[in-house]
Amino acid sequence: MMTLITGLLIPLLGTMLGSAFVFFMKDEMSPRLQKSLLGFASGVMVAASVWSLLIPAMEMEADSGKWAVAPAAIGFLLGMGFLLLIDELTPHLHIGTDKPEGMRSHLSKTAMLALAVTIHNLPEGMAVGVVFAGADSGATNISLAGAIAVSLGIAIQNVPEGAIISMPMRAAGNSRWRSFMIGSLSGAVEPLGAACVILLASLLMPALPYLLAFAAGAMFYVVVEELIPEASNGQHSNLSTIGFAVGFVLMMVLDVVMG
């Protein structure tokens, strides 16, 4: 039980660590560092989606022959569609822009930025929950060590994400503690989402291949719709490409070595 609780909380600790950068770094993050971190986060999320979610989803349906890919394909598309719907309905603001997206709202920029990060973190929490549910069920090739590897990978990805949230908020005039708290709270949805998936695991077990792919699709949506455009826009895009490669390889190694 303690291993499970620790696994669910590790990603939140990564967000808190990144948010704490606001205490010992200058108020504004350099464009070079921000591009590198965005690319790194993208690489980790893509690798986790492929190695820890999509491949296990297809392996669970190996007895279906050529149709083994069907649950993974359906779940992936549903995951992307779900995040697209949430993105359209929820008022939010992306980093580096003053143009709100989603439904019209009178929320402050700080609140809309926090909502954007919550949308981002939701699929990551689902991914952690579903891999732990898969490891606990014994119905997949996902081991407990493999589930912890996913949790660690997302935590590593959350370190730059926490910094990318807290430091611009500090630069906008918020206090260091307020910037740290909002950055940290943006990651609270991850353990909550993971816990909900695990609590419902017994009911959802027949649909586990779909859920694994659903989480992968949702994570891919965040990467394609948010992270890659922000990483590629403007100067220093080569740094984001290098960061992507490093993040992808790191997550791949974690999954293979620990899985």
Regions found by a protein language model. Name each.
Residues 1-259:
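Intrinsically disordered, metal-sensing/regulatory segments
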